[in-house]
Structures are given as structure tokens and as C-alpha cells.
Amino acid sequence: MEIRNLANELNSLPYHGRGIVIGKSEDGKNAVTAYFIMGRSANSRNRVFTERDGAVFTEPFDASKVEEPSLIIYAAIREYENNLIVTNGDQTDTVYDFLKEGRTFEEALETREFEPDAPNFTPRISGMLTFDEGDFTYKMSILKIKDPQTENWI
């Protein structure tokens, strides 16, 4: 299998959207995760990543230009106990809250759907790494629209 450079792959695309990467370092000793975003609208492009209280948040670069804050301001990466949650939207907090209640990643995401940003209906992408005894497992989910006419989703 050919190993490719993710930055080069993304930079070769005119629009790469949002994405989550979960895996291991080349030597297999460390977990690796990455979250990247690129916006279509001026509202989506008006954001930066900030770190505070052990979490990574998206925040507006220029607060005076925010049009729809619910779609661009959220915790993107958050820890709870031995879990690292990474998502492309405010479902990070949904997963976090469910875990705090003793519930699961899957139960949390069953309460959510794609983003309400017609006509794009941006998929909600979520991942969770669970660390245990020097290794980790992970789960991923994508909630996206199946049929824009009926708004059925998968």
C-alpha cells in the first residue's frame, strides 16, 4: 500500500470540506487524530481553532461577520474519562453529555441528524477514540441526508 501525504492530498483539491482522521502513528505507538475544515460560505470561512480547558473549539475570526453561529461555533475535540471525542459540529457536546450520563456514542448520535444548512445538508461526522491498557479502539459515524426532496437521512 502506498503511503500518501494527507496535506498534499487535501491541497490538491479545490474544496475538501470537513474531515476527521483517526489512526496510529507510523511506528504504531501513538494514537493520531486530526480534524480539518474548509468553508463554502463566508460564514463558514470565518472561523479559527482555539484551545481552552483541554478542548478544541471553533470560534469566529471576526465576530461582527457571524451569520449563523450554531453552525460554526462548537467544541470540535473534547475528552471525557478515557475517551477523546472529535466531530465536525455541536454533536461533540451531545456525545460528551451522553457519556457523562453513562450512555453511549451510538445513543448520542441517534438523537442527531445532518446539519440544517440547505441546500448542502452538511453531513455530521463524528469519531471517538477509547484508550485502554496502552492501546485504543475507535468508532466513527456519518449522519447524512439520503434524499434532499424528502429529507430522509441515513
Positions of PLM-derived features:
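Conserved short alpha-helical segments that host acidic/polar catalytic motifs at enzyme active sites
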Residues: 1-154
